[in-house]
Amino acid sequence: MTTREKDLQKGLRLLHLLHQTNPYPQTPGTASQRRNRRRRWKRRGLQILALADRIRSLSDSPTEEPLDLAVQRLQELTVEDLPNPPTSTPTAQAFTCIPPVWDQLVPRSNPSSNEGCERDSCEHRKSPMESSQKDSGSNHRDPQEDQTRT
C-alpha cells in the first residue's frame, strides 16, 4: 500500500470519527429547546463538512509516481478486437416471420377462449357478486345486455 493510500485511509477514518461524534439530538424538551438543539447539531455538521473538505484537499497532492511510469501504464492498455459486423442485409422475408413468443397468443376475437381475458379484452367475465345481484332483482342494468338486445 502506498503512502498516498495510507493517508487517504487515515483521512477517511478521521471523517468517520467526526461524523460519529455528532449524533442527531434527542427528542425530550420544549419545542424551542428541540429547535435550538437541531440548530446547533446542523451547525456542527456544517463544520464537520468544512473539515472534511480541508482533509480531502490535503490528500489531493500530486502523485508520487513519475510521469514516465504513468505514461507507460497507459501505453500497456489494449483494446480487444471486435468481431466483423454481418455483411448481409436483412431481407423482407426476415420481417414477416413471427417471433416464437407470439405463436401462442390467441386473438381476442376468438369467442371460445375466455382464459386470456384481461383489462384490454372486449369480453367481460362476471364475478359471483354480479350474478347474485341479478338474482336478487336489483335495478342495475348491464350495458352489454342493452347492446345485445338492439
UniProtKB/Swiss-Prot annotation:
Subcellular location field = Host nucleus, Host nucleolus; Host cytoplasm
* UniProt-annotated stretches for the region Homomultimerization: 14-22
UniProt GO MF annotations: DNA-binding transcription factor activity; RNA binding
Q: Where is this motif: Nuclear export signal and binding to XPO1?
A: 69-80
Bias category Basic and acidic residues: which stretches?
Answer: 116-128, 137-150
Print the keywords alphabetically. AIDS, Host cytoplasm, Host nucleus, mRNA transport, RNA-binding, Transport
This protein's GO CC annotations: host cell cytoplasm; host cell nucleolus
Task: Note down the stretches annotated as region Disordered.
Answer: 20-41, 103-150
Primary location class: host cell
Q: Which GO terms describe its biological process?
A: mRNA transport
The UniProt entry annotates the motif Nuclear localization signal and RNA-binding (RRE) at 33-47
Mark out the compositionally biased spans (Polar residues).
Answer: 20-33
Task: Tell me how this protein assembles.
Answer: Homomultimer; when bound to the RRE. Multimeric assembly is essential for activity.
Please explain the role this protein plays, according to its UniProt record.
Answer: Escorts unspliced or incompletely spliced viral pre-mRNAs (late transcripts) out of the nucleus of infected cells. These pre-mRNAs carry a recognition sequence called Rev responsive element (RRE) located in the env gene, that is not present in fully spliced viral mRNAs (early transcripts). This function is essential since most viral proteins are translated from unspliced or partially spliced pre-mRNAs which cannot exit the nucleus by the pathway used by fully processed cellular mRNAs.
> Domain remarks in the entry?
The RNA-binding motif binds to the RRE, a stem-and-loop structure present in incompletely spliced viral pre-mRNAs. This region also contains the NLS which mediates nuclear localization. These overlapping functions prevent Rev bound to RRE from undesirable return to the nucleus. When Rev binds the RRE, the NLS becomes masked while the NES remains accessible.
This protein is called what?
A: Protein Rev
Recite the lineage of the species.
Viruses, Riboviria, Pararnavirae, Artverviricota, Revtraviricetes
